[in-house]
UniProtKB/Swiss-Prot annotation:
<dbReference type="GO" id="GO:0009507">
    <property type="term" value="C:chloroplast"/>
</dbReference>
<protein>
    <recommendedName>
        <fullName>Maturase K</fullName>
    </recommendedName>
</protein>
<dbReference type="GO" id="GO:0003723">
    <property type="term" value="F:RNA binding"/>
</dbReference>
<dbReference type="InterPro" id="IPR024942">
    <property type="entry name" value="Maturase_MatK_N"/>
</dbReference>
<keyword id="KW-0507">mRNA processing</keyword>
<comment type="similarity">
    <text>Belongs to the intron maturase 2 family. MatK subfamily.</text>
</comment>
<dbReference type="InterPro" id="IPR002866">
    <property type="entry name" value="Maturase_MatK"/>
</dbReference>
<dbReference type="Pfam" id="PF01348">
    <property type="entry name" value="Intron_maturas2"/>
</dbReference>
<dbReference type="GO" id="GO:0006397">
    <property type="term" value="P:mRNA processing"/>
</dbReference>
<keyword id="KW-0694">RNA-binding</keyword>
<keyword id="KW-0819">tRNA processing</keyword>
<dbReference type="Pfam" id="PF01824">
    <property type="entry name" value="MatK_N"/>
</dbReference>
<keyword id="KW-0150">Chloroplast</keyword>
<dbReference type="GO" id="GO:0008380">
    <property type="term" value="P:RNA splicing"/>
</dbReference>
<dbReference type="GO" id="GO:0008033">
    <property type="term" value="P:tRNA processing"/>
</dbReference>
<keyword id="KW-0934">Plastid</keyword>
<dbReference type="InterPro" id="IPR024937">
    <property type="entry name" value="Domain_X"/>
</dbReference>
Length: 509
């Protein structure tokens, strides 16, 4: 405990980050304006009144300190003269300035703790969202239980601001930040409606994303500390997680929650074969030991969210299942551990034995029903999966229509090429192919059969099923044994480590 306390005392000396003067620097808002100006959705019909001016920003900030503007509710913000005629533009410029300023100390801190070569190496290894699946294939086959965790959403913006105060000691900056977010929720009430947080997240996406990610990072840092402490692992690689002002207060609160016996509690948590993966607003905790240990972690997570972050979470948000009997959703896939049983005949002297061998394999399949729902939402088929035409695209040329459908099909094929079974993927391709043909026939005011017979587009539309082989031919030489083996064995999976984000059709979770 003393060595941690000495370390925290040194860490506090690095927390003298004075961000308040940066709020009045012109280059901060100039940078925010230049970034927003590049977004087409933000600069449409801005007009002369939307031009950036540091004088306007300073006037808005000075008005935020006036007492008569502290009783404004979110419903009256549109009529409030504080924001002037361009409330959305001015508030977003200030929000972008806040986001840029608050990111500076954490960027400098992470950059100073890592060497340039380590940053480049970590970026290359973790830039793809599919990099988690090879890890799961190596680790999850040895595990038995999995907890599907839904991270609770913060009910009040004050929680997000308060977490940030644990890291940066600058009272004027946080006072100004509170005054700014006051326009979007009523700070006098403890519970804020989801509509207020939703409005704030849409109006200030960069600032809200930073605050929310920091909220998730904060609870994960405490979890990582307990996990490493219980497994007797070295903590040097996680030194950045300990730089908090109220770290010991949190730790003492954990002692109270778990019967005032911190070392005894850690013995319950001791599990070297436990793995944690977070994606979007969910996370997965997998272990090899008995369910009692998973229930201990579930109990810990619920108390952590309620006691530290004032976020109420129902026990149903954490579901504990056996990997061999239940599947879990991960980044648009359905995954489970399948038992492969095989019988081997062994002959010893004059006796013959039958030995049953059980092997575990991580099965990752394409979720056909959620994908059909996504296609139906995009007007490519109905809810039953029957392809329909896309009349919205009928004004484009034939090549543009085919190129649009091919682009969607290639993206889905590229994303789901690591699945164990390709049958569902071929069904999705078939739906897109018929939807493309019906769209072309609708454009030419003809039937599908008459259009195909007249235009002879069957060979062109075969690209819906041949682009996978073309991609593999670019990766491997055509006469290579690896490519021939992949063609012979269709069940092999290939994970492309260049996928930075998921397709909108994949985002059905």
């Amino acid at each position: 405990m003393k060595e941690y306390q000495v370390y925290l005392e040194r860490a506090r000396s690095r927390q003298q980050d004075f961000l308040y003067p940066l709020i009045f620097r012109e280059y901060i808002y100039g940078l925010a304006y230049s970034q927003n100006f590049k977004r087409s959705s933000f600069v449409e019909n801005l007009g002369y009144d939307s031009k950036y001016s540091l004088l306007i920003v300073k006037r808005l900030i000075s008005r935020m300190y006036q007492q008569n503007h502290l009783i404004i509710s979110a419903n009256d913000s549109n009529k409030n003269p504080f924001w002037g005629y361009n409330k959305n533009f001015n508030s977003q410029i200030i929000s972008e300035g806040f986001a840029i300023v608050v990111e500076i100390p954490f960027f400098l801190q992470s950059g100073s703790s890592l060497k340039e070569s380590e940053i480049i190496k970590s970026y290359k290894n973790l830039r793809s969202i599919h990099s988690v699946f090879p890890f799961l294939e190596d680790k999850f086959t040895y595990l038995n239980y999995v907890s599907d965790i839904r991270i609770p959403y913060p009910i009040h913006l004050e929680i997000l601001v308060q977490i940030l105060r644990y890291w940066v000691k600058d009272a004027p900056f946080f006072h100004l930040l509170r005054l700014f977010v006051y326009n979007f929720c009523n700070w006098n009430s403890f519970i804020t409606t989801k509509k207020s947080i939703y409005t704030f997240s849409k109006s200030n996406p960069r600032l809200f994303l930073f605050l929310y990610n920091f909220y998730v990072w904060e609870y994960e840092s405490i979890f990582l500390f307990l996990r490493n402490k219980s497994s007797h692992l070295r903590l040097k690689s996680f030194s950045v997680f300990f730089e908090r002002i109220f770290f010991y207060a949190k730790r003492e609160h954990l002692v109270e929650v778990f019967a005032k016996d911190f070392p005894y509690t850690l013995k319950f948590f001791k599990d070297p074969l436990i793995h944690y993966v977070r994606y979007q607003g969910k996370s997965i905790l997998a272990s090899r030991n008995a369910p009692i240990l998973m229930n201990k972690w579930k109990h810990y997570f619920l108390h952590l969210w309620q006691c530290f972050f004032d976020v109420w979470s129902q026990p149903g948000t954490i579901k504990i299942n056996q990997l061999s009997q239940h599947s879990f959703q991960l980044l648009g896939y359905f995954s489970n551990v399948r038992l492969n049983r095989s019988v081997v005949r062994s002959h010893m002297l004059q006796n013959t034995f039958l030995i049953e061998i059980v092997r575990k394999k991580l099965d990752i399949i394409v979720p056909i029903i959620p994908l059909i729902r996504s296609l139906a939402k995009g007007k490519f088929c109905n809810v039953l999966g029957h392809p329909i035409s896309k009349p919205v695209w009928a004004d484009s040329s034939d090549l543009d229509i085919i190129d649009r459908f091919l682009r969607i099909c290639r993206n889905l094929s590229h994303y789901y090429n690591g699945s164990s079974k390709k049958k569902s993927l071929y069904q999705i391709k078939y739906i897109l192919r018929l939807s493309c043909i019906k769209t072309l026939a609708c454009k030419h005011k003809s039937t599908v059969r008459a259009f195909l017979k007249r235009s002879g587009s069957e060979e062109l539309l075969e690209e819906f099923f041949t682009e996978e082989e073309e991609i593999l031919s670019f990766i491997f030489p055509r006469d290579s044994s690896t490519l021939q083996r992949l063609h012979r064995n269709r069940i092999n999976r290939i994970w492309y480590l260049d996928i930075l984000f998921s397709n909108d059709l994949v985002n059905h979770e």
